[in-house]
Amino acid sequence: MNSRRLVQKTLCFDKPERIPRHKGILPWAEKNYPEFVQRLHEVFPDDVVPAPSVYIEHLDTRGDRYKKGTYIDEWGCIFSNPLEGAIGIVQTPLVADWQDLDKFNPPQATLSIDREAVNAFCRQTDHFVLMGSFVRPFERFQFIRTMEHALIDLVEKPPELFELLDRIHQHYLKEVEVWASTDVDAISLMDDWGTQQGLIASPDVFRQIFLPMYKEYAEIARHHGKYLFMHSDGHIMDIMPDLIETGVDALNAQIFCMGVKELGEMYSGKITFWGEIDRQNLLPHGTRQDIQQAVYEVWLHLYQNGGVIGQCEFGLEANPENIFTVYETWDALSETERKA
């Protein structure tokens, strides 16, 4: 069974032959452990891959997203990065005063996707292919205003807030439409909604302002026969029912801070858990037995004839041997499931 079909059967809870793999390898790992990363790719090849981000028009970016220093992205948002191999944070707002809003325009170049190049890639691979960028209205709003100003805006709700959000959303609708018209298998959303204990903003803000946006992205995906994948960090238990109702097929979330058993009791069989394994404690500090037990718990509580993609992040301070153990354990559990 090829990778694309394997992932499709997983998303449909149709007894895939094994747990699909998707390694989240950050530049930090590639820089510090290049030989180990190569070994991971050879022994545990991915089943899920991103499409190439090939644009006909030039994206106006400056600097390197993962290098120490300043990086300016295609929207003009300014990121300050104190650490090599990671992503920086925005400290200077692109729209500092609402009077500056008229000067702000989303980057039209991101709509100039080279569809022929993307489609050729999809034809030549049997992997399950995600779109080559992420749709992130909540985070983009924060990048434009900074997180501090954005959260104040969501409390005060000035009319300019809704004008800005509409510009962001209308642009992302076009971007989703362009990607959905290619041969990729899935549309990708990415908004971090949680802190370690709960939501960054209230559930009402999420449901009244941002959930309708996600529903429109989902509608486009469905119209074109695409799956919908989403990443969201933090404790997002309060909005899980909304994401499932919206039509998110696979969710990459910090399942260990929410409780793997609790998630399984409520949502196993209703959504595919696209990873992960605890990257805050277990991957940096856990023993081999800790990692094996963690993977087993995910399988025990979340797997239901599918519904789990073996994903974890090889990022800052992760123990390389623990990453290897994650995928080694997933393969062992897949073998156990086949023999059952």
Regions found by a protein language model. Name each.
Residues 44-51, 89-104, 133-144:
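An N-terminal domain-start capping segment
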Residues 33-36, 62-67, 83-85, 143-144, ...:
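Short aromatic-enriched loop/helix-cap "lid" or pocket-rim segments at secondary-structure transitions
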Residues 28-64:
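Segments that shape or occlude catalytic/ligand-binding pockets
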Residues 62-110, 124-128:
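A contiguous, low-structure linker/loop signature
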Residues 15, 25, 40, 58, ...:
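Alpha-helix termini
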Residues 20-24, 33, 37-40, 63-66, ...:
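N-terminal capping/small domains of soluble enzymes
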